[in-house]
Amino acid sequence: MTKPYVRLDKNDAAVLLVDHQAGLLSLVRDIEPDKFKNNVLALGDLAKYFNLPTILTTSFETGPNGPLVPELKAQFPDTPYIARPGNINAWDNEDFVKAVKATGKKQLIIAGVVTEVCVAFPALSAIEEGFDVFVVTDASGTFNEITRHSAWDRLSQAGAQLMTWFGVACELHRDWRNDIEGLATLFSNHIPDYRNLMTSYDTLTKQK
């Protein structure tokens, strides 16, 4: 049976950035590295733009997974940061789950590396506990397309909604009249073609 449309609500959503670590990022091959980095930072920017509670977590930083990428540390200097000693599934870490539940939000926007493990495991666990889960596919990465689609199939069959960061931003925003300049600036910073669109729009507007 098809699940009813559950719309993202900026007043009931939190962002979970899972295991965007230097070592793990070297494994991402299903999307170009520069595009992937841009998408992750775009998700971070939209989380800040909409004032969404955001949680960072890493696993086994002292091992080959490596440290959290510095760009995310700089983007979120004061956000909860859970360095898991070894738990593969972030939901198995008590501090992480406490931080998630402390947000008071029921909609979880999740992205991470690698998709079929670091994203899928906590997403499936959260669904089991009654959360609505939205997986940001283009801010999550893995080894290859086969692995990616296997993860997406498992997640969607369990009830997760698969989205892109652009779709997340638009659904949270709801109405262009809320703040066209602010959201358009966010898009322009991460989508070159959108920057061209806004440049054209600004030029035409000034001519009127």
UniProtKB/Swiss-Prot annotation:
Superkingdom as given in the UniProt entry: Bacteria
GO molecular function: hydrolase activity; identical protein binding; lyase activity
Enzyme active site: C118
EC class: lyase
InterPro entries in the cross-refs: Hydrolase_YcaC-like, Isochorismatase-like_dom, Isochorismatase-like_sf, YcaC
Pfam family, one: Isochorismatase
EC number: 4.-.-.-
PANTHER family according to UniProt: HYDROLASE YCAC-RELATED (PTHR43559:SF3)
Quaternary structure note: Homooctamer composed of two tetrameric rings.
Name by which UniProt lists this protein: Probable hydrolase YcaC
Organism annotation: Escherichia coli (strain K12)
